[in-house]
UniProtKB/Swiss-Prot annotation:
The keyword DNA-binding does not apply. One of its GO terms (cellular component) is cytosol. Gene3D superfamilies: Queuine tRNA-ribosyltransferase-like. The active site is at 93 (proton acceptor), 268 (nucleophile). The lineage of its organism: Bacteria, Pseudomonadati, Pseudomonadota, Gammaproteobacteria, Pasteurellales. The gene is tgt. Catalyzes the base-exchange of a guanine (G) residue with the queuine precursor 7-aminomethyl-7-deazaguanine (PreQ1) at position 34 (anticodon wobble position) in tRNAs with GU(N) anticodons (tRNA-Asp, -Asn, -His and -Tyr). Catalysis occurs through a double-displacement mechanism. The nucleophile active site attacks the C1' of nucleotide 34 to detach the guanine base from the RNA, forming a covalent enzyme-RNA intermediate. The proton acceptor active site deprotonates the incoming PreQ1, allowing a nucleophilic attack on the C1' of the ribose to form the product. Its cofactor is Zn(2+). This is Queuine tRNA-ribosyltransferase. Keywords: Glycosyltransferase, Metal-binding, Queuosine biosynthesis, Transferase, tRNA processing, Zinc. Homodimer. Within each dimer, one monomer is responsible for RNA recognition and catalysis, while the other monomer binds to the replacement base PreQ1.
């Protein structure tokens, strides 16, 4: 993988990730949003439908794909691309966040994490080395190191110990990745909770080891938005400019805009797909809650500005009807729309950076939603 940086507008960056795959060269234009395909599928969508929304890269989940279908089935197919028939780039997370989410079912030691398999209850073990081996079998174009996702709230001492162990795990991940002869990209993950000095130590340690890109982890885990913005403002300028920056597990449309505003290149989140299944649909001026009875006889499209299959063909009343009847097509049409909304937003962001008018775009984006522009956190202190 290569990262090319074309243009900046303030802290916002316009570039691309370039991947050499057996099927040819693939570019992922950045800033990019990656739909989440936890179990090797973006829920309810064929790969062709996902591609039609504008997605150029997907996220797969190492932890869940390891438990089901497992490495052996994956190897029999070739890799995850062959298994799910998506022959464009795939990023896989390392399983660290899922293990963190298990709470009391897990025990973290220096060696790795022992936990109870949520499917059948058996005790299993995941380590940095094992995560690298699973992701090698998945054929991930971008592999994430195995880390501990520091919870919120956490004391300074806990966040420090957690971050230091994540750094040791980062080195073990790098070593096993190299031993396997993996020619794909490996990203480090910056930890340190809401503490700026810990984030700095984490980044310096990762840069010393050397990675193809750097993710900001341990945000969007319950901390106030102001803390997330402050950490991004602090750490992004210190990440090597020739490497992509990835904000993990984020988020709402506003979070994408705020991330780009602070120098982030890549995002992933289940929000567009999960919200679609729950009838929360993103539109130009906010959200349509399609379950609201006021849409029962509304013959207008979901979003007149949207060019997706759903908006071009169906009314709000039809989407309301499908949801009310529990029809699978409703969830599918909602998902197509929400994914397209996210990709259109990213395309608008990229164009605004190219035209060096990103600050104006931010003002327009919030004005459409009737919201104020959030202040920059560190600028307020000076």
């Amino acid at each position: 993988m290569k990262y090319e940086l074309d243009k900046t507008s303030g802290n916002a960056r316009r570039g691309r990730l370039v991947f050499e795959r057996p099927q040819g060269t693939f570019s992922v234009e950045t800033p990019a949003f990656m739909p989440v395909g936890t179990y090797g599928t973006v829920k309810g969508m064929t790969p062709e439908e996902v591609r039609a929304t504008g997605a150029e890269i997907l996220l797969g989940n190492t932890f869940h794909l390891w438990l089901r279908p497992g490495q052996e089935v994956m190897r029999k197919h070739g890799d995850l691309h062959d298994f799910m028939q998506w022959h464009r780039p795939i990023l896989t997370d390392s399983g660290g966040f899922q293990v963190f989410s298990l709470g009391k079912l897990r025990k973290i030691t220096e060696e790795g994490v022992k936990f109870q398999n949520p499917i059948n209850g058996e005790r299993i073990f995941l380590s940095p080395e094992k995560s690298m081996e699973i992701q090698y079998d998945l054929g991930s174009d971008i592999v994430m190191i195995f880390d501990e996702c520091t919870p919120y709230p956490a004391t300074f001492d806990y966040a420090k110990k957690s971050m230091e162990m994540s750094l040791r795990w980062a080195k073990r991940s790098r070593d096993r990745f190299d031993e396997l002869g993996n020619k794909n990209a490996l990203f480090g993950i910056i930890q340190g909770g809401v503490f700026e000095e810990l984030r700095k130590v984490s980044l310096e340690g990762l840069v010393n080891i050397g990675f193809d890109g750097y993710a900001v982890g341990g945000l969007a885990v319950g901390e106030p938005k102001e803390d997330m913005h402050r950490i991004l403002e602090y750490i992004c300028p210190q990440i090597p400019a020739d490497k992509p920056r990835y904000l993990m597990g984020v988020g709402k449309p506003e979070d994408l805009v705020e991330g780009v505003r602070r120098g982030i290149d890549m995002f992933d989140c289940v929000m567009p797909t999960r919200n679609a299944r729950n009838g929360h649909l993103f539109v130009t001026d906010g959200i349509v809650k399609i379950r609201n009875a006021k849409y029962r006889d509304d013959t207008s499209p979901l979003d007149p500005e949207c060019d997706c299959y759903t908006c071009k063909n169906y009314t709000k009343a039809y989407l309301y009807h499908l949801d009310k009847c529990g029809e699978i097509l409703g969830a599918r049409l909602n998902t197509i729309h929400n994914l397209r909304y996210y990709q259109r937003l990213m395309a608008e962001i990229r164009q605004a950076i190219e035209d060096d008018r990103f600050d104006d775009f931010v003002v327009e984006f919030y004005a459409r939603m009737g919201k104020p522009v959030p202040p920059l956190q560190l600028a307020d202190k000076s």
